[in-house]
Curated annotation (Swiss-Prot):
Catalytic-site annotation from UniProt: 50
Subcellular location: Secreted
Name used for this protein in its record: Sphingomyelinase D
Keywords, sorted A to Z: Hydrolase, Lipid degradation, Lipid metabolism, Magnesium, Metal-binding, Secreted, Signal, Virulence
GO cellular component: extracellular region
Catalytic activities: a sphingomyelin + H2O = an N-acylsphing-4-enine 1-phosphate + choline + H(+)
Note accompanying the cofactor annotation: Binds 1 Mg(2+) ion per subunit.
Signal peptide: 1-21
């Protein structure tokens, strides 16, 4: 059968007096199904506890079924603290204390795949105990020997010294996430983040209330397609609140993300009706989709 390209070329050749045409078979654009890195089913879903800032919060998250936790990290002159707001009164637990508690619980049999460090001020210090290098040192001293991997999160990596420090010395237990829309994330990983291995590239996107960011579902779908086509390793969405089962379904089903941050809108994680209910939304969704999704085990490697 003569291809459309040959017919068009022949017509144009007649008009322009071109000597000959080459028959190039018609080709459809590359589809997601043709990409090489699409996760096999059933794929693991990571339930990530939001804004865990205390040892009690770590314990509660594990009790609720979280298999990863997100800790906001802020550097002060005295070092790194589990601190979201960066106010003199907002950080009460050091990074070291948080990491030691995670390691203790993991060694006691708790399943935590990774700790996501949402770094609020990665460029606060170039060296010393307030530098990103020191935060990494603590993670490697306490978390990684216990079998807990680390995800370093950045919101503005373009001109960040801290981002480059993590990027340049990344080991196999660590990965990097950028919080931005899929198009901007693509530029980061094609530019300043291009040396990061694909499996260790993460894209995350979300808001304290997904109601105010309705385009997020399509955008995260594009990030998941980038994962399927081997340009990033994982895509995560946030934040799932109690009663938002339709958002869980859309993010895990339509958007195809690998995990969800869940919890409350703007408070530290604790044992409460709201956090328990939000965690249950994810676990129940997985139970209802056993052919395509599953709870990860400690043997699963997120990167």
């Amino acid at each position: 059968m003569v291809s459309l390209s040959l017919l068009l070329c022949s017509a144009l050749a007649g008009l322009l007096h071109v000597a000959s045409c080459i028959d190039v078979p018609d080709q459809a654009p590359l589809t997601v199904d043709e990409c090489k890195c699409k996760p096999t089913s059933p794929k693991p879903v990571y339930a990530i506890a939001h804004r865990v800032l205390t040892e009690e919060g770590i314990q509660a998250a594990i009790a609720h079924g979280a298999n990863a936790i997100e800790i906001d990290m802020t550097a002060w002159k005295s070092g790194w603290w589990a601190d979201h707001d960066g106010l003199p009164t907002s950080g009460n637990v050091t990074a070291k204390a948080m990491f030691r508690e995670v390691a203790r619980l993991r060694e006691d049999g708790a399943h935590l795949s990774f700790v996501w460090l949402d770094i609020k001020n990665p460029d606060w210090a170039i060296s010393g105990r307030s530098s990103v290098a020191y935060l990494r040192k603590l993670a490697r001293e306490y978390l990684e020997p216990a079998g807990v991997r680390v995800l370093y999160g950045f919101s503005n990596p373009r001109n960040s010294w801290g981002f480059k420090e993590i990027r340049n010395f990344l080991n196999a237990n660590e990965s990097v996430s950028v919080w931005m829309d899929s198009g901007d994330a693509k530029k980061i990983y094609a530019g300043v983040g291009r040396s990061i291995p694909v499996a260790q590239r993460v894209v995350d996107n979300g808001l304290f209330s997904l109601f105010w960011k309705p385009y997020i579902f399509d955008d995260l779908r594009r990030s998941s397609e980038a994962r399927d086509c081997c340009t990033v390793g994982k895509a995560f969405g946030w934040t799932i609140l109690a009663g938002q089962d339709r958002y869980v379904d859309k993010l895990l089903g339509y958007s195809g993300v690998d995990g969800l941050i869940y919890g409350t809108m703007a408070s530290a994680y604790e044992d409460s009706e709201d956090t328990r209910a939000a965690a249950a939304l994810i676990s129940n969704w997985i139970k209802n989709h056993p052919d395509t999704h599953r709870v990860p085990t400690q043997d699963d490697k997120p990167w």
